[in-house]
Amino acid sequence: MAWFFAPEPVMVTADEALKGGRHTVLENPAPHTVLGTPVTGPWKEGQQRIWIGLGCFWGVEQMYWQMDGVEGTSVGYAGGFTPNPTYREVCSGRTGHTEIVEVVYDPSKISLEQLVARGLEAHDPTQGFRQGNDVGTQYRSAYYTENEEGAARVKAVVDAYGETLKQHGFGEITTEIGVISPSEYFLAEDYHQQYLDKNPDGYCPHHSTGIPCGVEA
């Protein structure tokens, strides 16, 4: 009997990536269907942003818009090379992007660490280029911030959780942590925005390890 296995996903290089360069995929997006807030701003004074990738972005966005202190969410793509990518292009693995949720929050009501911890608990950050049966570089675990100070705070939470996971027999965390500018986050098509509000019977499972992160709420 022969066994056939799909090759492991490989991250595309900048030279290999699709060139893109077209107009923005989603221009003039409608307000958030749940929160009623603008998807692209203007933001209130004091609001902050973080970009989070935990696999399929439909369920991740719903999880975050339900959190107290979160005042805006959208879904899109970041971490790659191709400007203004389409969903189909991202799914090809030839853009370098991962599926991302932009979270706009009030730091006086919820901390960056709490947002990071909630994400870590909602997926398996040791799976590399996959989450469950969703396989590809576009499903990799990632946190992107607007500055190095934010990235350092994210790394502290991720590193601590990595030690906890090791104590429970898990491998190394593969979460990508970086700094991006807002212009490096590309909105996904309208169809994907607040998908599980528009499609209540839609399916997008989380792949939690079941191990708590330990960050105080």
Curated annotation (Swiss-Prot):
A Pfam family of this chain: PMSR
Biological process according to GO: cellular response to oxidative stress; protein modification process
This protein's GO CC annotations: cytoplasm
InterPro entries: Met_Sox_Rdtase_MsrA_dom (IPR002569), Met_Sox_Rdtase_MsrA_sf (IPR036509), MsrA_MetSO_reductase (IPR050162)
Annotated coiled-coil segments of the chain: none
Catalytic residues, chain numbering: C56
Disulfide bridge map: none
Keyword 4Fe-4S listed: no
Keyword Oxidoreductase carried by entry: yes
Keyword annotations of the record: Oxidoreductase
Family membership: Belongs to the MsrA Met sulfoxide reductase family.
Its job: Has an important function as a repair enzyme for proteins that have been inactivated by oxidation. Catalyzes the reversible oxidation-reduction of methionine sulfoxide in proteins to methionine.
Protein name: Peptide methionine sulfoxide reductase MsrA
Organism of origin: Corynebacterium melassecola
Gene this chain is encoded by: msrA
